[in-house]
């Protein structure tokens, strides 16, 4: 039996203005644009191999915190983003992680896959080094972590982040697989022949 396509829900969280939406847009649209802050929640789906990623982006603003429970529910991965030019945004990741765990009621937070992105590495005013960020995350967040230095502006490691998720998910059993018989090929040409009985 052929395996179906897996749907993986990925939420992207962190303080406002750390580049969450720019990361998402760089990956999905393959371009960088300076954006206004996200209002509420943004959602896109992209396919990688036999995995479809549902990417959920939120504003990072306090007034939208009531949306988080429905936004977080059913997440398979959580991407925590901070700005390498603003040390406080790194320290706030623990609060974001703890809030995510509390609202999703994850059974085993140590095993849940968190991906940490140190964004804006293109900025010459970087204050958080990769080594310092990794060590801080190990000491304060712990668990199943993967770290990437990224730049949405210069397209550094953006593709690699989502390829990593896709590759990790390809061989894992998933309860939300789409059976192959329900997949529709958009590239297959149908025959124009008709038959009569």
Swiss-Prot record:
Lipidation (S-geranylgeranyl cysteine): 196-197
Example GO biological process: hypotonic response
Gene3D superfamilies found in the cross-reference section: P-loop containing nucleotide triphosphate hydrolases
Binding site for GTP: 14-21, 33-38, 57-61, 119-122, 152-153
InterPro entries reported in the protein's UniProt record: P-loop_NTPase, Small_GTP-bd, Small_GTPase
A Gene Ontology term for the protein's cellular component: late endosome
Highest taxon in the source lineage: Eukaryota
Molecular function per GO: GTP binding; GTPase activity
The keyword GTP-binding is annotated on this UniProt entry: yes
Xref: PANTHER family: RAB FAMILY, RAS-RELATED PROTEIN RAB-7B
Family: Belongs to the small GTPase superfamily. Rab family.
Function: Protein transport. Probably involved in vesicular traffic.
Name recorded for this polypeptide: Ras-related protein Rab-7B
Organism for this UniProt entry: Dictyostelium discoideum (Social amoeba)
């Amino acid at each position: 039996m052929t395996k179906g396509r897996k749907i993986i829900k990925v939420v992207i969280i962190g303080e406002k203005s750390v580049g969450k939406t720019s990361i998402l847009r760089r990956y999905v649209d393959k371009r960088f644009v300076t954006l206004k802050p996200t209002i509420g929640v943004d959602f896109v789906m992209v396919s990688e191999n036999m995995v479809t990623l549902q990417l959920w982006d939120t504003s990072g603003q306090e007034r939208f915190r009531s949306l988080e429970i429905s936004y977080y529910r059913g997440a398979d991965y959580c991407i925590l983003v901070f700005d390498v030019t603003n040390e406080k945004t790194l320290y706030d990741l623990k609060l974001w992680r703890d809030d995510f765990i509390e609202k999703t009621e994850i059974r085993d937070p140590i095993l849940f896959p968190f991906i940490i992105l140190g964004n804006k590495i293109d900025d010459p005013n970087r204050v958080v080094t990769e080594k310092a960020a990794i060590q801080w995350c190990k000491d304060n967040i712990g668990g199943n972590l993967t770290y990437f230095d990224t730049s949405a502006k210069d397209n550094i490691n953006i593709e690699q982040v989502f390829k990593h998720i896709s590759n990790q998910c390809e061989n894992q059993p998933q309860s939300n697989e789409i059976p192959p018989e329900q997949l529709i090929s958009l590239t297959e040409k149908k025959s124009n022949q008709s038959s009569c009985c």
